[in-house]
């Protein structure tokens, strides 16, 4: 897929460091015949290399926003631009390929295959992208070493702690060398010690590799570790602050 597709439009005045732009983005769901507006005219940029937290109470629209940023769902209104390209102009197949190439995901429930080892779980996205067995094994092994799980590559998820499972999930997200990693409540199922460990590990990967991280949280303690924090309330951005 070429992103020089003639149907793709490009917004003007995009700073060189801007990776993602949301322009008056809204998301509406139908509850029976009743429309529910989960997000209202969201407008903000995500810059390359940022470590950004979207925070707020349950029901504020955080997960809905992450699904839009991760290009899993399309906005009801507005436009999303990734590296200057309007994602709404891509076909479903083009969007799937683009998302697979550029975005990694970390889930609060880990989403690991229980019958596969840690190594096999990390190899999965590489196989999907057509990476051969030997190369996939080498890259997955290195990814697990990077998150401190070299001794557990053959362990299945049920033999790992919650923190270890989330480290496998981080390795799986990073093994495809994405430009953006989306993490929806990555510490929700972890205790305070493991929560800070996971955020510190994500931060380390962000700094070492220059990968952009966007994660959601309702835990204010984690906000001290970020470059920027965006408060979402009732589907609207209430505050957008850079940290010292």
Task: Indicate where each model-derived feature is located.
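ABC-family P-loop ATPase nucleotide-binding domain
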Residues: 1-28, 239-244
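ABC family nucleotide-binding domain
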Residues: 19-225, 229-232
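H-loop (His-switch) and adjacent beta-strand-loop-beta switch element
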Residues: 229-241
């Amino acid at each position: 897929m070429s992103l020089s597709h003639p149907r793709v439009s490009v917004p003007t005045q995009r700073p060189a460091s801007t990776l993602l732009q949301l322009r008056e983005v809204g998301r509406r769901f139908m509850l029976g015949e009743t429309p529910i507006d989960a997000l209202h005219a969201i407008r903000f940029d995500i810059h390359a290399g940022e470590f950004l937290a979207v925070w707020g109470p349950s029901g504020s629209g955080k997960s809905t926003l992450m699904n839009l940023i991760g290009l899993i769902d399309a906005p009801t209104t507005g436009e999303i631009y990734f590296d200057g390209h309007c994602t709404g102009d891509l076909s479903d197949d083009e969007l799937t390929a683009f998302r697979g190439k550029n975005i990694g995901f970390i889930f609060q429930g880990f989403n690991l295959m229980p019958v596969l080892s840690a190594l096999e779980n990390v190899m999965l996205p590489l196989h999907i992208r057509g990476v051969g067995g030997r190369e996939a094994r080498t890259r997955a092994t290195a990814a697990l070493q990077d998150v401190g799980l070299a001794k557990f590559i053959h362990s299945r998820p049920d033999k790992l702690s919650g923190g270890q499972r989330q480290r496998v999930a981080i390795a799986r997200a990073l093994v495809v060398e994405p430009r953006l990693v989306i993490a929806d409540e990555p510490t929700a199922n972890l205790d305070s010690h493991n929560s800070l460990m996971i955020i510190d590990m994500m931060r380390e990967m962000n700094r070492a590799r220059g990968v952009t991280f966007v994660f959601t949280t309702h835990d204010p303690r984690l906000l001290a570790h970020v470059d920027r924090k965006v408060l979402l309330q009732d589907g609207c951005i209430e505050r957008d602050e850079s940290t010292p």
